[in-house]
């Protein structure tokens, strides 16, 4: 622990020095900077050279990773040890994308036979629905799927569908997550129950929001097809066969997954069955292959050449060395527009903790606030704040080197924007440059005195650039696995368990208590504000 404390001290000292430097000038001072801070892995080009660290800062960050035993933690995770200590579980979402003959064990017990058995069932179901061998109650083939889930049972599959969906899908895929009747009504308004397959995703089949939407879906089906007919339009992702049977789902249409798969890591599992059916098995299998390729890199590459480790260390350098408490993720790809929403759960639910596995308060700041949206749209929204705001927010840009979608020339325009933003954030624009421009335009000295400071850009805003060769199932799988491993590395260094989520429980319990109070109109013991709101909102 003394070595770890010393490593933290060195990182903070190095960050203080680097924070006084201009990133743009580091390229001159460090001739090997670009080569040292760019990697090509599994169809991804990753450029960390515009980050705020200098050579000494990078060295201090790597020393911290060694002191925190990232390598040992990595070995324990891939070895199937119960690194989710609060729940006594292994963490093996990597097994879901491993080859069927891989030697993967949870607590010493081989798991790949079970994983492969579920994959075989998923593939058979996918092909049967797509071919029309599995039909609805009226004999019509399924033309739409309604995916019902929330959290990890929604965010991952929804992003996966956006990334992989055909331009003109033969099977449409819709999602319902929120316990808000408006979402269900709007999503199903133009669907035909006779041609819609409903897939309910809940490991325990007890999730309140999901069951409420599932009940609405069943009523919607039953109104058109009858109770027995509705059963033919149901499938489930769950381990609670008794509950799915009671709901009307045949056992051969229930697909499970394991306790060693956390919800936010579950899109590699049967949780994404709806996407496999809508996109085809080949696309889903390619997604798994891309994740496996990134797993191999993360498992085998030394820390100084390890993409997930370096991206994690850049965030730790910004968060803990430079006190940057937020990070903006901006995909310059319409298909990846939900990436920031997915990463909000992955990173903030994993590492948004103030207590470590030993029950003691952590000694350093943990997860940053993640936000973001689609580029170039955000340039006309919050990028004013990114360029000239009082707080410096590191950014992460995600782009595609090539895209065949859309009219000719549009992709080049998109790329020009992402490259310009990253450069502008780093180099900025001096008051002198602005003054020269205004003088050339004949602006008076009095006006220049007020306008020039407003039009200057301080620059020195750090960013990372992640470029996919193309958006394919394989490169998308590699991208998601990269972020998963990055999140794991950060958790190891911060000293938190990245695989539990006790922070979501209290609100669930209190909502369960408040619901009957809203229905009865009799508020229980609450603070004055909540009691008054219950009185105002009672049903």
Swiss-Prot record:
Pathway(s) served: Carbohydrate biosynthesis; gluconeogenesis; Carbohydrate degradation; glycolysis; D-glyceraldehyde 3-phosphate and glycerone phosphate from D-glucose: step 2/4
Keywords: Cytoplasm, Gluconeogenesis, Glycolysis, Isomerase
Catalytic residues in the record: 349, 380, 508
Alphabetical GO biological process terms: gluconeogenesis; glucose 6-phosphate metabolic process; glycolytic process
Domain of life: Bacteria
Broad class of the protein's primary localization: cytoplasm
Annotated InterPro entries: G6P_Isomerase (IPR001672), G6P_Isomerase_C (IPR023096), Phosphoglucose_isomerase_CS (IPR018189), SIS_dom_sf (IPR046348), SIS_PGI_1 (IPR035476), SIS_PGI_2 (IPR035482)
Reactions catalysed: alpha-D-glucose 6-phosphate = beta-D-fructose 6-phosphate
GO CC annotations on file: cytosol
Cellular localization per UniProt: Cytoplasm
EC assignment: 5.3.1.9
Gene Ontology MF terms: carbohydrate derivative binding; glucose-6-phosphate isomerase activity; monosaccharide binding
Family named by the database record: Belongs to the GPI family.
Function: Catalyzes the reversible isomerization of glucose-6-phosphate to fructose-6-phosphate.
Protein name: Glucose-6-phosphate isomerase
Gene: pgi
